[in-house]
Design a protein with these regions (language model features):
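Active-site-adjacent alpha-helix of alpha/beta-hydrolase-fold enzymes
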Residues: 174-228
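Short beta-strand/loop motif that positions the catalytic acidic residue
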Residues: 166, 172-174
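Short beta-strand element of the alpha/beta-hydrolase
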Residues: 64-72
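N-terminal membrane-anchoring alpha-helices
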Residues: 1-45
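Conserved alpha/beta-hydrolase fold motif
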Residues: 126-127, 150
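Conserved alpha/beta-hydrolase
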Residues: 84-104
Length: 245
């Protein structure tokens, strides 16, 4: 075998190995804790359905308001079940959108299909954690007329998704000990959000505790419990969408 063929074969094997590593990387998301899986069961208060989407519907609610949720990058969508369950228990219809390869960047416009599937919902909010929030911003940039509000959890818009001139209601919740979506990053991207944006900082919280999965590399150490962070998160969202706690 001549040198050129050897080099070509070597290059092919390197690319193949890299592709295999990438597929393995995107298909090994942070897995949900058992506490999250406990909220994947229908109860007397909330009906849970798992199909193309994971939906939570309060059995004694009118479900006039809906929340579409984009998970964080490489995080199993079930890790957000407790928050979506609690919101549904208080009257919201909540939808977690599983993403291709667990990365919302591959399907930022997924919310459009959700809205069409459930036409009886009067007011839709779109929310997302980390990368999911950034892609929710991308959706709003292109389809703001379909949305009543935007909820960002440890997230901010990409430079190309400037929403500063939008009149949409926006809630940005972040955490003081977040090592990934740091306070500095939140502050430096405020110029990309509308001036009426409501900001709420969870003191002592971190990036990982916005969901129910194990610690991410690079995150800061939380000074409060996961449950306390989740309670503050729930309370802030309910206030924003004007629902009783």
């Amino acid at each position: 075998m001549d040198v050129l063929k050897i080099l070509a074969l070597t290059a092919f094997l390197v690319v193949l190995a890299g592709a295999g590593w990438l597929v393995g990387w995107v298909n090994t998301p942070a897995m949900p804790m058992q506490q999250a899986l406990d909220f994947m069961q229908t109860t007397q208060e909330v009906k849970v359905d798992e199909g193309e989407y994971i939906t939570f519907s309060g059995l004694n609610a009118n479900n006039a308001k809906g929340i579409i949720f984009y998970p964080g990058g490489r995080v199993d969508p079930k890790a957000y079940a407790p928050l979506m369950f609690e919101l549904a228990k208080r009257g919201a219809f909540t939808v977690i959108v599983p993403m291709p390869f667990n990365l919302a960047v591959f399907s930022p416009m997924s919310a459009s299909r959700v809205i069409k599937r459930y036409p009886y919902i009067k007011d839709w909010y779109i929310a997302g954690h980390s990368l999911g929030g950034a892609m929710a911003c991308s959706f709003v940039k292109n389809s703001a007329e379909d949305i009543a509000g935007l909820i960002l959890l440890a997230s901010y818009p990409a430079q190309g998704d400037d929403l500063s001139s939008n009149d949409l209601d926006v809630l940005s919740i972040y955490a003081s000990n977040d090592g990934l979506a740091t306070v500095q990053k939140i502050d430096s991207t405020k110029r990309l959000l509308p001036p009426q944006t409501v900001y709420y900082c969870i003191q002592g919280g971190n990036h990982t505790q916005f969901g129910w999965y194990l610690t991410q590399d690079g995150d800061g150490q939380a000074d409060i419990s996961r449950q306390q962070q989740q309670d503050e998160l729930l309370s802030s969202i309910l206030k924003f969408i004007r629902m009783k706690q």
